[in-house]
Each structure stands twice: as C-alpha cells, then as structure tokens.
Amino acid sequence: MASKGGLKTIANEENEERFGYVFAVSGPVVTAEKMSGSAMYELVRVGYNELVGEIIRLEGDMATIQVYEETSGVTVGDPVLRTGKPLSVELGPGILGSIFDGIQRPLKDINELTQSIYIPKGVNVPSLAREVDWEFNPLNVKVGSHITGGDLYGIVHENTLVKHKMLMPPRAKGTVTYIAPAGNYKVTDVVLETEFDGEKAQYTMLQVWPVRQPRPVTEKLPANHPLLTGQRVLDSLFPCVQGGTTAIPGAFGCGKTVISQALSKYSNSDVIIYVGCGERGNEMSEVLRDFPELTVEIEGVTESIMKRTALVANTSNMPVAAREASIYTGITLSEYFRDMGYNVSMMADSTSRWAEALREISGRLAEMPADSGYPAYLGARLASFYERAGRVKCLGNPDREGSVSIVGAVSPPGGDFSDPVTAATLGIVQVFWGLDKKLAQRKHFPSINWLISYSKYMRALDDFYEKNYPEFVPLRTKVKEILQEEEDLSEIVQLVGKASLAETDKITLEVAKLLKDDFLQQNSYSSYDRFCPFYKTVGMLKNIISFYDMSRHAVESTAQSDNKVTWNVIRDAMGNVLYQLSSMKFKDPVKDGEAKIKADFDQLLEDMSAAFRNLED
C-alpha cells in the first residue's frame, strides 16, 4: 500500500496473512471475515483509510469490530489489518495541559497538522509529542542496583506544578546496566537499560498500557482524608474522600457540569482528569477557556490550573463507539498519576451518554436488551469502571500512597432517578449528590437536595474531624436535624399558617431559612463565594447553630415568666446580629485571609452571646 499524502501508514508491511476483509458494515459496527487468530479487544485498522477499531466479538473466522471513527465509505472487501495489540494509551511526560479525544489522539496536534476543525479519517498522530525535549533527572538509581516494577528511577519537571515521576513498568525487573545522566531527552530516547536472566531490556520515558486493564497495586487502603470541594453543602453535609466514588445525578439545567467544573478548579487533588463523554462541545470549550485563567496557590506560588489538568474530550458529535473508550482512557491516565503517589480526581461527564453508547452498540450486535433497552451487562461495566477508584499503596519503592477519586455525572431522562443507569450507579458508589429540579428552578445553586443525598464516608472521616475540627460533627448532626424538622413543619405551615406555631418551631423555621439561603446556597461565579475553605464552613455553621441554641434557650427559659421572650422579640432586638449572620458568606478567603475571618466569626459569637444576655435580663 502506498503512503498517502506523505503520512506514514502502518500498512506498509505487506503481510497478507495479517489481513482480513470487510464482510458487512452497520454504522460503527463492522463484521470482517478471514480473521482467525485474532484476539478479543485486539486493535485493528479497517479499510483503506485505516480507521481505528477494536474486536468485540469472535465467531469462527468472523470478527465483529467496533470502529472509533466515521465508517462512511467503507465497502465490502476492504482490508482489515490486525495489529496484534490491545487498545492502549501512551503514558509519559506531556499528558498534563493537553486535550485528547476518546482514543487519546492529541486534538491540538491534529489541528496544527491538518488546519481543519474536524479530525480527518485514519489520522495517525502519536499521542505524546515526539520532538519535545524534557529535562530528565535520575534519582538514586545506579548501575548495578536492582529495580522492579513500579520503582521510581527519575523525575521530569513536566511543568512548574507537577513533578512527573518516571516509573518502571509494573511487570519489569532486573539489574540496571545503564541509566541516562541528567539532561534533555525526547520521550522515545532510552533512559534506562536493565538485564534479567541474560536478557537486556531498554526503557524510554514512554509506557504503553492497555486501557481495559487496571494498573496493579500493592494493596488497597481504607480512605481517611476528605476530598474538599470548596462547596459548603458538599463539604459539610455529604463529604467525599480521596479515593472515593461519587454520583451526581440530575435533570438538565440542574448544574451538574458546574459542580464538576468547581471540583476540577478548587478541590484539594494534585491532578485532575476531566472526561467530557458525549456532552455538549460548548462545555469542553468552556473548560478550555476558563481553566488557563484560573490559578491555584501551592507552597506560596500561584500557578495556572491547566497545568494539573488533562482533558479527554469526546463530545456528542464524535463517533459513538469512542465514548466507551474515552472513559477507559481517562481512568488509565488517572491510575498512572496515582502510581506516582498523587491524589487524582477524575470527572466523568456524563456516564449516561456512555451507557447510551453501550446500548447503541449492543443493539447493533442484536444482543438481548434488558431494562429500557440497555444491555444486561450495564451494571457490570459500570462496576468495573467505578471499582478502579480507591486509595492504594503503590507498587515499588520508595513507599508512597496515591488515590483515584471518581465523580460521575449522570443525566437521567426527565430527572427520573429510577432510570436503570442511575439505579445501577447508586448501587456502586458511596456518595450520592442528588440534584433537584425544583431547587434549580428557584435558582438555589448548587441545587443539591439535602433530604435525598447521602454519603457513606461519614464514619471514615470522623478521625480527621476529631483531630482538626473537633466541634464539627455535632454541628453537622444539628444542621441535619433542623433541615429535617423544617421539612416536617412546612406541611403544617401550609395548613394553619406560621402564626399558630409554637415559638420554638418558629425559631426552627427561621434558622432553617437562614441555613438554606446563606449557608447551603453558593454562587460559583462570585469572587468571595466560588470557593469556601473548610475553616470558613465550620465557622459559619458554628455561629448559625449557636444562634439557634441561644434563641431556643431564651424562649424556653422565659416561657413561664412575665416578660416572655418570643421569636418576634428576638427578631426585633437582634436585627444587626441576623444581618451579620446572613452576610458571613461575603467574607473573601483570598482578600481577608484565614486569621481575619476566624477573628470576625469569634467576634460575632461574642456579640451574639452579649445580646442574648441583655434580652434575658
């Protein structure tokens, strides 16, 4: 086969045995004959344009292939080239800050190469740039030292934010016979050579790993550190841990993407992998537009957030089959950074589109449909993806721990949480942040319904709170009680009106309103409230709950005396305190700093105590 347009093609090797022939085409599913000897999930190139595909079923010498590109123009009898390897990703310096499609093709490089906003068919560009020089510094590995899978042998400063640690591939071992001196190298240059049983092996900075196979670890550890999101309602009521799994189901327009993006911008993770899977192209372009401008401060240095982020963009107008691959590509990249000892967060937006891709492929294969037409193996596929999260002890030396946290957005049609994808996901994940259409319509964002959401990591995090914020756990319990009580009271209020309630119930209603409007609600697009550090969250809670306790005490202790304290009396006397309570969220953590905010909150607590003492006297 001649090379076309100067692009080198992999079919230059004329091996007739390695060809099969197209037998039938049905959308992204191609059937090929004369394919005996090929393996499940083997990568193939279909047709004269060499479209990337993957074998998903074998019968006799017929293979069913799902193609990750547009199949228009493929005809019966076209050659199918077997590559003999599974669908894999390239791991090495150059991942962060770049944007890939579902099968890890670098979109920026393709755009520069072709000057087109669309990806041409059969384009064959390496995932990581081959001509860039990276500065390699060897670690304490010398010639003659023994090295096994997962050991660190060098560091590349990929950018000023992330140190890219060079790992031995998991299954490698041997005695070092050569290690490159410090200097600039390309990803394909040999930087390490080992010998084992008389066989020499050479390693470059580049590793290739099959996406459907989880990377091995020494052991899984229980998670014990919170994934702080900067969103008050999530950090206080429904915390997630580093290494946890979370689902954000919600109807359209409830703010799933804004929560995912807020997590990517402000969470306490070291690396973010953002997978846009079958969502709008505008959402990915928004990420590309916003992230380079946002900064994060680490060890006193301000850096662009894009330096810790990699994007896997597979928008709704890209081929369906690649949606399935994009989730696996994202999780494999995450596991690679986890193995370096980093805490990684992976956002999948949205897993429903991924399930729909499974449904479409399954329909074309004429498999037996289960609930709502989804394939019977939907639950198993979802589980195999979510179970790759977790906090782990990494392979190799030196000892290090890493974690992968998965946050999956789910968009059930019509916001119905009994949809099969949502139901299957909720059986697997540990944290459920349920978004509510009614709250979103009232413009209460983040629109997380505090009555149906839950987190199963509460107990795992108790030690962390005991050490750092001892007063927090009782405060959280109290908040949940107040919000639950308010829900029960709201029905009575609708029947008989507010005036006929007991005084303590009036206080409960007012404090719940204060909590909802000034604590749970948060404006992602304001400088003071787009990110709320945990000390501010705890301080705000403490003051609001203290106000509740003092009000109830004042009412209950004077109930029998002549000058009764009622809610109206408190409201009239405490106008200033109430105003200060509701303006606590306007304190800007960046401008004011931690010490000033804490001092202000303590001062407010003192003023409040003094005001209540005056009332009761």
UniProtKB/Swiss-Prot annotation:
Q: How is its activity regulated?
A: ATP hydrolysis occurs at the interface between the nucleotide-binding domains of subunits A and B. ATP hydrolysis triggers a conformational change in the subunits D and F, which induces a shift of subunit d. The c-ring is subsequently rotated and results in a continuous proton translocation across the membrane.
Q: Which reaction does it catalyse?
A: ATP + H2O + 4 H(+)(in) = ADP + phosphate + 5 H(+)(out)
Q: What is the main EC category here?
A: translocase
Which Gene3D superfamilies does the record match to this protein?
2.40.30.20, 2.40.50.100, Bovine Mitochondrial F1-atpase, Atp Synthase Beta Chain, Chain D, domain 3, P-loop containing nucleotide triphosphate hydrolases
InterPro entries documented for this protein: ATP-synt_VA_C (IPR055190), ATP-synth_a_Xtn (IPR031686), ATP_synth_asu-like_sf (IPR023366), ATPase_a/bsu_AS (IPR020003), ATPase_F1/V1/A1_a/bsu_N (IPR004100), ATPase_F1/V1/A1_a/bsu_N_sf (IPR036121), ATPase_F1/V1/A1_a/bsu_nucl-bd (IPR000194), ATPase_F1/V1_b/a_C (IPR024034)
Q: Which superkingdom is the protein from?
A: Eukaryota
* EC number per UniProt: 7.1.2.2
Cellular component GO terms held in the UniProt record: lysosomal membrane; proton-transporting V-type ATPase, V1 domain
Per UniProt, which keywords does this protein have? ATP-binding, Hydrogen ion transport, Ion transport, Nucleotide-binding, Translocase, Transport
Q: Where on this chain does ATP bind? A: G250, A251, F252, G253, C254, G255, K256, T257
Tell me a Gene Ontology molecular-function term this record carries.
ATP hydrolysis activity
An example GO biological process term is: ATP metabolic process
Query: What's its job?
Result: Catalytic subunit of the V1 complex of vacuolar(H+)-ATPase (V-ATPase), a multisubunit enzyme composed of a peripheral complex (V1) that hydrolyzes ATP and a membrane integral complex (V0) that translocates protons. V-ATPase is responsible for acidifying and maintaining the pH of intracellular compartments and in some cell types, is targeted to the plasma membrane, where it is responsible for acidifying the extracellular environment.
The similarity comment for this entry is: Belongs to the ATPase alpha/beta chains family.
Q: Which NCBIfam families match?
A: PRK04192.1, V-ATPase_V1_A
According to the record's subunit comment, the protein's assembly and interactions are: V-ATPase is a heteromultimeric enzyme made up of two complexes: the ATP-hydrolytic V1 complex and the proton translocation V0 complex. The V1 complex consists of three catalytic AB heterodimers that form a heterohexamer, three peripheral stalks each consisting of EG heterodimers, one central rotor including subunits D and F, and the regulatory subunits C and H. The proton translocation complex V0 consists of the proton transport subunit a, a ring of proteolipid subunits c9c'', rotary subunit d, subunits e and f, and the accessory subunits VhaAC45 and ATP6AP2.
Q: What is this protein called?
A: V-type proton ATPase catalytic subunit A
Annotated source species:
Manduca sexta (Tobacco hawkmoth)
What would be the name of the gene that encodes this protein? VHAA
